[in-house]
Amino acid sequence: MLQHVTLEIGRDRVDACVRFWGLLGFEPMVAPPLLRDRFVWVAREGTQIHLMPVDEPIVPDEGHVAVLSPDYEAALAALRDEGFELQAGSNAWDAPRMFVRCPGGHRVEIMSAPPYPPWPGEGGG
């Protein structure tokens, strides 16, 4: 099970990133004392995102974090209401998904269902 992902973000993007992850159901949590001056943490259902404010964040173009949304349509509506631009992903497993850039620049995939075979076009079960 994936426990956490660390994302570098610009120092001026912390509040905006915490708000963004909140739209996806992640809530702020207190980091351990040893790490509080270097990280801001958010969590949902045992999974954590560790936001690491830095002067020059490294943000991959295509690499991304994927999250399963318990209420997919509500999450998309909340993101749209906040002005985020959504990009449709391919329908690789007969379940809608969208991509968005968080305020820190990272690509985030919002999934309506997890990928699981049988894959479309391959039949079977």
Give residue ranges: language-model regions.
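N-terminal beta-strand motif that seeds the catalytic metal site of vicinal oxygen chelate
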Residues: M1-V18, G63-V65, P117-G125
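Short hydrophobic/aromatic beta-strand micro-patches
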Residues: E8, A66-P70, R101
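Core segments of cupin and vicinal oxygen chelate
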Residues: E8-Q48
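Short acidic/glycine-enriched loop/turn segments that link adjacent beta-strands
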Residues: L34-R38, V59, A92-P96
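Short hydrophobic/aromatic beta-strand element in the GNAT-like acyltransferase core
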Residues: F39, Q48, A66, R97-F99, ...
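Short, charged/polar, Gly/Pro-enriched secondary-structure boundary elements
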Residues: T47-H50, V59, G105-V108
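Mid-chain, well-packed structural core segment of small domains
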Residues: G63-S90
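Vicinal oxygen chelate
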Residues: E82-G125
